[in-house]
């Protein structure tokens, strides 16, 4: 299996090769070398182990999930590292690779606009591949080869209700999710093009927007285009991509939008999104940065981008009031819906925590009443409640830990907070010293933020469980 997935991932070097060939860029050779190396390594390993017939256990699923996200990050960094014209150290290339494949969108490259077009496309492609998860794509293919992947899929799908199955045929479900994801990307590309964005930029931004990755073809990000329609498209597709993709699957399979209307998590998420947009609009309008129309457009885009952990930005977001940026950074912890390409804690968990808090208040008011926590008409079990509280505690603990470590390295508190929020939430937008580039971080800080990005993307548990002594017992 390991060899097959490496071999499969090596094929992702072919599209950048086509782009480099079309634009007659020297990076063609770099991508070709990367393709050949990992095609041979992966193919050789697959050929020697494909008849082993080893059955995966739950423990193996967790190990493989973490191992492959690390492995794919290293492979993603390889072409960036070996190209001498980019002048990136291995740590810088690794940071860029991890940021791309985890859909974080943070970059150490100061002048993105100067990159060859093959690399601009490649970075957006990393976002797209990482968006729904390399494992989801693998699970759609592996069953056809007679390799069981159910345990991997259960480990990858986030959320307290992740054990629920969509259909009896996992491969069909995964394939439908991938097709839905691709169609959303195509729709975004078309809308960007209609809004006036050049075709190449539209393709790159389209696939990075629906993945909520945030890599751009310009150093100024979306602000480069100075176009209200482009910002509306980016904000709208950021919100759409924050929907639970299970809902998109049900909508397609049942040919009805009722699941979107009835889903309590989605309604809660949209309510929070509306509140964040309104508050942000009022703040920037109140201080006179823009007129009322401009305040709404810019706030709709940036609030949607940061709330959903997309990370695309307007050119002058760093000049916004500090309290507004801090408010948006805090909103990035909220994230979107469970089962989406968002980072963050996710809206369903916050909804459960809110319901639990309300339940405790009611219980204190009526000590003898037999009350329960209900979400969408269903009673939340103690097991789910423990899972949500445990996740919230661990997420907060790691966030505080990383902030204190960066602050101890000499970075000011705002820079430390913004950097950690950008990485662990897979949001990608820094502030303070990292507003324009994360290249200002030292190598140790970059490595720590790589860990934060992977922790955020895998939602902590698959990583930390590997350090549990109980996990390794027979």
Language-model region placement:
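Membrane-proximal intracellular helices of multi-pass ion channels
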Residues: 1-474
């Amino acid at each position: 299996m390991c060899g097959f997935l490496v071999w499969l991932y090596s094929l992702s070097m072919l599209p950048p090769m086509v782009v480099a060939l079309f634009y007659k860029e020297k990076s063609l050779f770099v991508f070709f070398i990367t393709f050949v190396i990992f095609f041979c390594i992966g193919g050789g390993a697959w050929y020697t182990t494909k008849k082993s017939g080893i059955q995966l256990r739950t423990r193996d699923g967790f190990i493989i999930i973490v191992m492959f996200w690390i492995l794919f990050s290293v492979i993603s960094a390889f072409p960036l590292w070996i190209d001498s014209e980019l002048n990136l150290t291995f740590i810088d290339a690794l940071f860029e690779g991890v940021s791309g494949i985890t859909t974080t969108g943070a970059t150490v490259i100061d002048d993105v606009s100067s990159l060859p077009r093959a690399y601009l496309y490649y970075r957006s492609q990393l976002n797209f591949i990482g968006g729904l998860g390399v494992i989801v794509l693998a699970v759609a293919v592996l069953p056809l080869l007679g390799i069981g992947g159910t345990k991997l899929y259960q480990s990858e799908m986030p959320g307290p209700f992740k054990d629920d199955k969509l259909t009896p045929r996992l491969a069909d479900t995964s394939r439908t999710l991938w097709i839905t994801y691709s169609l959303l990307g195509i729709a975004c590309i078309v809308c960007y093009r209609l809004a006036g964005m050049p075709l190449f930029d539209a393709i790159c931004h389209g696939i990075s927007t629906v993945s909520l990755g945030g890599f751009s073809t310009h150093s100024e990000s979306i602000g480069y285009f100075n176009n209200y329609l482009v910002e509306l498209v980016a904000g709208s597709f950021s919100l759409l991509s924050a929907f639970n993709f299970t809902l998109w699957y049900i909508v397609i399979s049942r040919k009805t939008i009722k699941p979107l209307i009835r889903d309590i998590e989605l309604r809660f998420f949209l309510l929070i999104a509306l509140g964040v947009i309104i508050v942000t609009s009022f703040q920037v309008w109140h201080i006179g940065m823009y007129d009322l129309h401009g305040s709404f457009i810019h706030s709709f885009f940036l609030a949607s981008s940061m709330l959903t952990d997309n990370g695309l930005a307007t050119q002058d977001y760093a000049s916004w009031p500090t309290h507004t940026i801090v408010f948006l950074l805090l909103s990035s912890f909220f994230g979107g819906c469970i089962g989406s390409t968002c980072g963050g804690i996710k809206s369903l968990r916050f909804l459960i925590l809110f319901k639990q808090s309300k339940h405790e208040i009611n219980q204190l008011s009526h000590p003898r009443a037999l009350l329960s926590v209900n979400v969408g008409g269903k009673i939340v079990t103690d097991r789910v409640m423990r899972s949500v509280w445990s996740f919230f505690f661990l997420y907060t603990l790691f966030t505080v830990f990383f902030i204190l470590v960066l602050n101890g390295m000499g970075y000011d508190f705002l820079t430390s907070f913004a950097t950690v929020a950008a990485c662990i939430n897979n949001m990608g937008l820094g502030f303070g010293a990292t507003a324009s580039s994360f290249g200002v971080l030292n190598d140790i800080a970059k490595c720590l933020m790589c860990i934060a990005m992977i922790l955020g993307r895998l939602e902590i548990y698959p990583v930390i469980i590997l350090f549990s002594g109980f996990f390794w017992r027979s």
